[in-house]
Amino acid sequence: MDYLSESLKLHYELRGKLEIQPRAGVSNKDELSLAYTPGVAAACLEIKDDVSKSYDLTRRWNTVAVVTDGTAVLGLGDIGPEAGMPVMEGKCVLFKAFGGVDAIPLCVRSKDVDDIVNTVALLAGSFGGVNLEDIAAPRCFEIERKLKERTDIPIFHDDQHGTAVVCLAAVVNALKIVKKQLSDCTVVFSGSGAAGVAIARLFDSMGAGEIIMCDRKGIICEGGDLTPAKAEIAAFTNKNHRTGTLADAMKGADIFVGVSAPGIVTDEMAASMAENAIIMAMANPVPEIMPDLAKAAGAAVVGTGRSDFPNQINNVLAFPGIFRGALDVRASDINEEMKIAAAKAIASLVSDDELNPDYILPAAFDERVGKAVADAVAQAARDSGVARI
């Protein structure tokens, strides 16, 4: 199928992938008076006296904003907020289909960090959570941080954290196959953007042995001429102060995680890794190294971002269930404990009998995923003290 042309036809036909359906009837005077004036005043006064009642008396409890500025949309780059709307609508469809979450796209016509933060913060009382989407680094880090400071609802940049959760789930199961512990592993990252940093932080929270982050210039190391964002990376990575190229970093490494550029890993670089290496080459549409080349070079398990190869790192395994769980307990945050719980829940859905080098993650359409992730995330929220009900 020619997905581009067929998708364009679908978009012209549907004129939007979302619509609003009323839950209250207004077919007669009494129904109208209950759903709207004068009866609605009773609900307004309840919320006036206790703002938390907005979760009980409106749809806020199940509603998430999907926010973009259109600066990093898929592989299309900075195409603007309006052009990003089809992607945001699609994301909202996935929220509903896989998590039962009502999501509303908000495309903000500004690239200014404070403009975006103020806009979303002022609207936060209408939502139970905010999913940031397709916002370019490094502004995405600052926007997320400032919104967390300004609001009391979960703020989650899926390009960072959704990718990190699914990648961690994949590695958890891959490590079972190669019989290694994450704490004993050297993990090399190619790409220091939003996803790379988030994955590295999550691996660090899980106790990874050594983390080495590489950008276009090579290994990131403390003491160099670093931007503030790179300095933050250097502070928790490369504890042995290694220097050199990506090829240097990969020598003897146990795990490679790529969120960078197509074809930058050669078969020689893959062959230089430790025995039974794990490679997650997630550049799209062309990975850092093709799976067949990686395996021929000695990699034991290979994952990519593509659906036509085994072991796709697909965010849809994570974000619907993560928000479902967070909303169910009215969480004030989505913290590291909740992300790790989500990753472990995803990994657990592949049984030991099923687990093999070409099957380390459940399928995107596996109906168990959303509930398993939601239940694990909700429990982690309770255990970590961010659940409010």
Each model region followed by its residue ranges:
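Short, ordered loop/turn segments at secondary-structure junctions
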Residues: 69-71, 79, 108-109, 134-137, ...
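Adenosine-phosphate binding glycine-rich loop
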Residues: 158, 181, 281-389
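N-terminal ligand-binding/catalytic initiation module
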Residues: 1-155, 374, 379-380, 384-388
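Generic structural signal for well-ordered, non-membrane alpha-helical segments
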Residues: 25, 29, 36, 40, ...
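Glycine-rich phosphate/diphosphate-binding loop of Rossmann-like nucleotide-binding domains
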Residues: 74, 79-96, 151, 157, ...
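Solvent-exposed alpha-helices and their adjacent loops that cap or buttress functional pockets
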Residues: 12, 55-60, 96-97, 122-124, ...
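Rossmann-like adenosine-cofactor binding region
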Residues: 232-301, 306-308
